[in-house]
Curated annotation (Swiss-Prot):
This is Neither inactivation nor afterpotential protein C. PANTHER family: AGAP011099-PA, NEITHER INACTIVATION NOR AFTERPOTENTIAL PROTEIN C. Residues 913-934 are annotated as: Actin-binding. It comes from Drosophila melanogaster (Fruit fly). Its EC number is 2.7.11.1. It is a peripheral membrane protein. The lineage of its organism: Eukaryota, Metazoa, Ecdysozoa, Arthropoda, Hexapoda.
Amino acid sequence: MMYLPYAQLPDPTDKFEIYEEIAQGVNAKVFRAKELDNDRIVALKIQHYDEEHQVSIEEEYRTLRDYCDHPNLPEFYGVYKLSKPNGPDEIWFVMEYCAGGTAVDMVNKLLKLDRRMREEHIAYIIRETCRAAIELNRNHVLHRDIRGDNILLTKNGRVKLCDFGLSRQVDSTLGKRGTCIGSPCWMAPEVVSAMESREPDITVRADVWALGITTIELADGKPPFADMHPTRAMFQIIRNPPPTLMRPTNWSQQINDFISESLEKNAENRPMMVEMVEHPFLTELIENEDEMRSDIAEMLELSRDVKTLYKEPELFVDRGYVKRFDEKPEKMYPEDLAALENPVDENIIESLRHRILMGESYSFIGDILLSLNSNEIKQEFPQEFHAKYRFKSRSENQPHIFSVADIAYQDMLHHKEPQHIVLSGESYSGKSTNARLLIKHLCYLGDGNRGATGRVESSIKAILMLVNAGTPVNNDSTRCVLQYCLTFGKTGKMSGAVFNMYMLEKLRVATTDGTQHNFHIFYYFYDFINQQNQLKEYNLKADRNYRYLRVPPEVPPSKLKYRRDDPEGNVERYREFENILRDIDFNHKQLETVRKVLAAILNIGNIRFRQNGKYAEVENTDIVSRIAELLRVDEKKFMWSLTNFIMVKGGIAERRQYTTEEARDARDAVASTLYSRLVDFIINRINMNMSFPRAVFGDTNAIIIHDMFGFECFNRNGLEQLMINTLNEQMQYHYNQRIFISEMLEMEAEDIDTINLNFYDNKTALDNLLTKPDGLFYIIDDASRSCQDQDLIMDRVSEKHSQFVKKHTATEISVAHYTGRIIYDTRAFTDINRDFVPPEMIETFRSSLDESIMLMFTNQLTKAGNLTMPFEAVQHKDESERKSYALNTLSAGCISQVNNLRTLAANFRFTCLTLLKMLSQNANLGVHFVRCIRADLEYKPRSFHSDVVQQQMKALGVLDTVIARQKGFSSRLPFDEFLRRYQFLAFDFDEPVEMTKDNCRLLFLRLKMEGWALGKTKVFLRYYNDEFLARLYELQVKKVIKVQSMMRALLARKRVKGGKVFKLGKKGPEHHDVAASKIQKAFRGFRDRVRLPPLVNEKSGQLNENTADFIRPFAKKWREKSIFQVLLHYRAARFQDFVNLSQQVHIYNQRMVAGLNKCTRAVPFERINMREVNSSQLGPLPVPIKKMPFRLDQIPFYDTQYMVDPANSISRQAFPNQLLTQHMEDDEPWDSPLQRNPSMTSCALTYNAYKKEQACQTNWDRMGESDNIYNQGYFRDPQQLRRNQMQMNMNAYNNAYNSYNSNYNNQNWGVHRSGSRRNSLKGYAAPPPPPPPMPSSNYYRNNPNQQQRNYQQRSSYPPSDPVRELQNMARNEGDNSEDPPFNFKAMLRKTNYPRGSETNTYDFNNRRGSDSGDQHTFQPPKLRSTGRRYQDDEGYNSSSGNYGVSRKFGQQQRAPTLRQSPASVGRSFEDSNARSFEEAGSYVEEEIAPGITLSGYAVDI
């Protein structure tokens, strides 16, 4: 409706004299001016009149025109129109000028003067604002923008409410609006929710919420969430409890209660404005208003000379868009992807594209950080930026890698648990850069111990020079797995670090691929020595023509800057490298050893061999002499070892000679191994030198950062790429277990309504790679040990018929990874995997005169292939709190460098197992994930390639993670742990708190939290609940620390003032006899400690050898006896169950025979009345028996299947002949750290949980999409961009995904959950029995017609079910319960007969047309050690690609109902067409045992 007479408005030209701008809003500017007609000072509000602002101008004009006569509203003098020829016209509102400015400006000026408004002044301003709002509400007007900047003060202290641009008229006092509009910090929850709501819910109570926020603003100087992005602020308003004053204890109870009443999240329970004005906080003001006005006038006068403070430009949100003055509305993209309204791939990609174009590389997914490599990530940040992320919550700042470091640091201090940060993604996605930024910020947070942080940063820089190299897609790629274990003392000050390196890609040293650059340190070293003119000292030549440097004649054009092509910069880098090593206590001799080893490796690469008959000989012997001189080894031994080796056969040593090709391979293996030992030596020395500051400053706390290879694919992929990608595959599996599977299982076990989380489970792919004996890595090991080539690998892969590992060509295999399918060349697999260095060469190096080189080849290796070294014992400051870290000490060595050699595959498997164990130590271990994504393939700043990003999103499960964080509970804590952490937030310090469920609920209610859930033993928190509690915890801890520091200062001052200063030497000298006794006592203790060493080694934590030999036979006897006792109890329990079952069968048999004897006389059919309903004729109904609920998880029985598991260490002693043992091989399953406790509780998960777990693990509901993931080729070549095939299927997938939940809930599963949760197994059909033995496959192969007839006959009637028959014995038509009167399931639970809860996954493998011999044999599903089922391999290898699941769930036989004919649930007749009662026999109903009634048709037998 038009209120403004636009055409008749006068022109303001020559009517006003404009002075200065006094305010600026989103839609207008306000100026102080003088009206020339009457010299009156007025306020001019000028705004553009266009289509966007027309409605707001009309509404503001109507409000000013009709209601400006109220004393708390500004006077309205008129409106004018200024025509503009080049733009929209301007509308000038002329209003009363308030010389005092805004209320919030006065508050901030007082705060700058270290003064604060008293509560009565705040109450007066709020009361006057309430009166203005009541006047508007009385006239059915919603203001919708009440805040401190819109409350004006006159020079005499009057209060005026202004700015009606967002005000709107409603139909009645309780009328509703439905537009999400306003300033974010002052929005009520219903206003924020209006963006998603379809019905209008905004009433005048929204102004009450804004009034409460304004009260906080006047008290603290700024509103809550003032420093947050609008999306973060709106998310906090909805999800978290209402905000409070910054320091509530500094204010009275009345103002806190007023704010609490105003900020009621439920709009229906929130008071009206007329009720708020009656609150004691406002009514207890003094009646003399003139006094209050004079006080405010004095404060205005006091703050007049204070310089105007800078204010951020105003903004407001309008239906998902952010508006600022003179700027186009920008769509509001959330910083947290878990806050997306409609989480689909398109919305996520659009949000990421917008953020990266705005220069924002990071986004949150709840508590997980998503990082996009924008090709311009900063390496250095000022101290002010670091300070923004110090002890802050996740939502207080923009998403950044520093927030992950800050949260991990706080969790480490609060929970006293080590924190892990795992970075994952493909190559060049920014993992190593983010890891370095994490370390920088952690050094900032832990700064305090002199020199500790500097040594840590320098050490990391030196290690990266050793292990980084250039690849075709990354000029600074990390070529190993690095663990940075940063240690901190009790107070959080950094004390040092422990560095662990695994899987160094040492083969890179000698590779012939020119596109793969060598490690950076080689280029640094050579260019530095060349610049220093020291080449002759290290037997090097002047040109860079070294085979291992791989320097091309001409530098090829590249978008990346490689270290190889920057000789000038390399000089400074190597100088920095040596300075770092000097700073961390490397002596000159050790630095010289490093130089000589690097020079020797370069020379080894230039050794040439020539053919001498059948064997090889060294062509350039002068290089061999130079190498022997550098390494200080015997030249003749070294020369001989290059072309000869010793073969021991039958106890006889024979000399063998290499061929030319074998000699080259041996030379390259020596160079690679020498470099690997050098890197291990340097890292071990760094760890050793770091141990002293850790002992001095303490190392009770730790944060471990895991930086590793990125997932990669080149034009030719070998064994190195297979290992790298398999490691990433395992890290993805660990992510799935922690984010998805653990949550669903815990929710089901705790009786929480289980949600359906979908993700792509890559366990089957990993099983095909790592499971013994058919996993690909075991196949490679078999080929390597049997000296076979790739033919054996290709044959074994072809025999598996797996869809995850396939034969691609004659020499190539394809592996379906979680990112896509990659092709690997197997021709060099076996040679590379052997990693064989001749023992003769090892012995040559052991005889080196250089102590460091001798040490590198003398000490043993760990199972991961790393060098061990002797560490000096350092006395810790507090031995009671000393922590042990994974150092490569001598006690960790178990592999000789000469004997018992391990393959690279064995080292790789042990490394993967070690990493999984470290990340899965306990359920409450803090693991923080950083998911890194590469934004493009062109290396352009802020470039965004949608197909590339989308493929990585699919691989990393970004969409599934968003849904999981929206619906799930990321934190799950036991009651005692939860109350131990947070009880002081809601309970008094002297209040007794029991660790119960009720107290957990009381804590949540006192804190006004929402979204949580309580299970039987655990608290379930959403990620924003956990963040809110952490923020409260941090605030309270700061207060505690401040109080403690003040009390300590007070006590210290009292002691000094009272003269109670403790002085040393106060005690006089003791008698010489006493001194002699003390010396003798100390000497005797020292002598005994030397004579009797401790039983446990302090460094390794293991028993010494003598003690272990003494204890071993007793421990073995005790263990065998314990196992025997367990087996006896197990066998006794099974015998007892068998006796119970036999007794029941005996009773059943006796009563059955007795009943049949009474029913031998047949009843004529014509005498049966089918319509009889008289109870007197039918007889009384049996009385139902009261039954106790039956729960398997309450039975104190634990599955002992693991005792006979061949993979278990106990069973290895019992079944030594059944294992394929290999020397020093670890047979532990690759996923053993993630397998759950094999107890009966885990076996007793309900069918619903199993159904959902199988659905998400196998993607049975979206088979096409899951097939697309592992069948799609993974390709990374910036020169040849390929269309992402997944993009073409996205629309169909999104449509299917949106309707997934409804389809899932409406699916007919054949069984239904009971309404009660007391019995999670109640209501499920019993499993069908195995079919009768069938003829062999040869019989059917020769008689196909007989096979067809038998198949049709079996499918014509349901299989018999004796368990269902027993159930029906105790029921009548009036009893709807499904529990038996006796515990027959308990009898069957430990027998081979399947239980009722397992019926839904059993399947008859009776497919037509199959020639397999066991196609008609009943096959129960396999069991893992956890007791949970997984799909049979046959299902995964089906040609349809449907994982073998949809048939098991969708085509299952429905169990017969209670009202079916008893014959259908008892034994089936041979002739299924018999329908008459005469053929069926006579109907009999008789109680054969107490509570057991037999009813059915009887025939003579």
